[in-house]
């Protein structure tokens, strides 16, 4: 059990309650501010610049001109209220500034003041405000209480994307010298060493060698975990969490078993040993592109034919939606395969071809449900049919175990609730927010558990898996009840002479 918290933990009940509005319940919550070294490594000022108000207003204008969608989102809200009870952070904290419309308004009120005629001449009439230190403080607090999950945009009749507003606000804050330590420090590690953990090549090689020994000892089969192998067919780009921690590492073992049994040559790159791209979270195109280009460089250097992403939600969004724009064209890869592919797509295709033999009885000790990760569910897809991001993972799970049960329909698929730790919030300085933000998913898990006695919840996102490992004990679940989809695959896979 985790250390007793210094905050009230929401209680699970028979159904998810919409809380009564309580002002400023999370006004104390904010992440650590980035140090000078973390800011400057990303091309941002090391501290708050002297003329920060003018710099921020100018940056806001630049972003609305550059990203027309952002301007539409700031102009088009009609205050219908459809989004108010859709945010997991509002449901878990009751703070009205965690309603999506109120979160948007923190930026919208400044936009109106400086970039609309009504706001310039009649600010009080249209809710426009000057950019002051108090407003900047609210930005820093509440734009770091948004996991950019985009659930609110599903229910907005105008499709307003609060995630885009949040990203813009964070980019403005970085530009004036007030960035978030957690995200910016991690991006700096990727720029320097190629992964979020700051693992150098020797440490990565030692880790993979140890995994080979562990798998051979357990199975009697030599399953390779290749590193920097030139001429391999597949470049696997996976979250660095897969290299060091449970339950992630069991997913990596599952990938390796799949590649081994299918007879696919593959490799990891020490230059691009990270699928995650936190540049997305801070709204920085330049930093997002710099991270993505490492993947292109590795693919060219190693001469691979395919790029496959591991189990990471936002990494798959960047890969599926933006990789070609950021780092393309990828005309040097095999045109027979999409660029990139998700490991679930690869495994699903191999199962359909009959190239993998699975024994679902190997997982008969498990009764499994599945958490749809936000960036997979609402910002990408899989396969060649609409909704593949929902069906493919479930079909892979059902091929690997006999006891699978979905959570309630309003909490999965396109309507899935966030884990509570995405969007650059997976840091212990925001643990209260993370625990409270997990409430809707924990309620859904309780509901399916009450009916079907669930033992495990599977996910295909490194952030989700890390988040649930942390918050499960707060709600009476065991931290080891969260597992990787490819742990199920790996445990069910019958190893032998590969094809």
Regions found by a protein language model. Name each.
Residues 343, 349-398:
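C-terminal amphipathic alpha-helical segment
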Residues 159, 243-333, 377-388, 392-399, ...:
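Cofactor-cradling patches in redox/metallo enzymes
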Residues 77-83, 87, 146-152, 156, ...:
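Short cysteine clusters
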Residues 85-113, 154-173, 381-384, 424-438, ...:
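Iron-sulfur (Fe-S) cluster-binding segments and ferredoxin-like electron-carrier domains
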Residues 174, 295, 325-333, 347-363:
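Extracytoplasmic substrate-binding proteins
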């Amino acid at each position: 059990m985790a250390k007793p918290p210094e905050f009230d933990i929401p209680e699970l009940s028979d159904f998810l309650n919409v809380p009564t509005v309580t002002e400023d319940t999370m006004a104390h919550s904010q992440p650590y501010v980035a140090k000078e070294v973390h800011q400057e490594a990303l091309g941002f000022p090391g501290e708050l610049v002297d003329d920060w108000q003018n710099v921020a207003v100018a940056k806001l204008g630049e972003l609305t001109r550059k990203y027309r969608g952002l301007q539409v989102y700031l102009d088009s809200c009609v205050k219908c209220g459809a989004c108010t009870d859709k945010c997991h952070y509002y449901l878990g904290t009751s703070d009205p500034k965690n309603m999506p419309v109120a979160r948007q308004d923190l930026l919208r009120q400044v936009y109106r003041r400086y970039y609309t005629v009504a706001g310039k001449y009649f600010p009080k009439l249209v809710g426009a405000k000057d950019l002051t230190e108090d407003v900047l403080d609210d930005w820093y607090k509440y734009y770091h209480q948004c996991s950019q999950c985009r659930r609110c945009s599903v229910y907005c009749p105008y499709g307003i994307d609060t995630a885009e507003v949040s990203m813009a606000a964070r980019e403005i804050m970085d530009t004036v010298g007030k960035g978030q330590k957690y995200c910016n420090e991690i991006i700096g590690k990727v720029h320097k060493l190629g992964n979020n953990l700051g693992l150098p090549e020797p440490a990565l090689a030692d880790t993979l060698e140890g995994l080979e020994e562990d798998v051979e000892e357990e199975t009697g089969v030599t399953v390779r975990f290749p590193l920097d192998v030139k001429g391999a067919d597949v470049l696997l780009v996976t979250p660095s969490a897969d290299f060091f921690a449970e339950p992630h590492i069991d997913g990596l073992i599952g990938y390796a078993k799949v590649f081994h049994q299918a007879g696919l040559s593959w490799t990891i790159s020490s230059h691009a040993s990270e699928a995650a791209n936190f540049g997305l979270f801070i709204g920085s195109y330049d930093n997002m592109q710099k991270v993505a280009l490492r993947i292109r460089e590795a693919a060219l250097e190693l001469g691979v034919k395919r790029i496959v992403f591991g189990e990471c939600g936002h990494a798959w969004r960047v890969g599926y939606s933006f990789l070609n724009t950021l780092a393309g064209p990828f005309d040097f890869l095999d045109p027979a395969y999409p660029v990139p592919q998700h490991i679930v797509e690869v495994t699903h295709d191999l199962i359909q071809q009959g190239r993998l033999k699975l024994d679902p009885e190997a997982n008969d000790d498990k009764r499994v449900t599945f958490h749809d990760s936000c960036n997979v569910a609402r910002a990408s897809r899989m396969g060649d049919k609409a909704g593949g991001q929902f069906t493919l993972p479930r079909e892979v799970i059902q091929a690997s175990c006999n006891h699978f049960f979905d959570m309630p329909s309003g909490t999965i698929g396109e309507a899935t609730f966030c884990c509570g730790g995405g969007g650059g919030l997976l840091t212990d300085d925001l643990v209260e927010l993370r625990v409270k933000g997990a409430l809707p998913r924990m309620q859904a898990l309780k509901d399916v558990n009450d009916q079907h006695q669930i033992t495990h919840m599977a996910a295909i996102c490194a952030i989700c898996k890390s988040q649930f490992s942390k918050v499960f004990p707060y709600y009476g679940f065991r931290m080891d009840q969260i597992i990787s989809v490819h742990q199920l695959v790996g445990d069910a896979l019958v190893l032998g002479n590969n094809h």
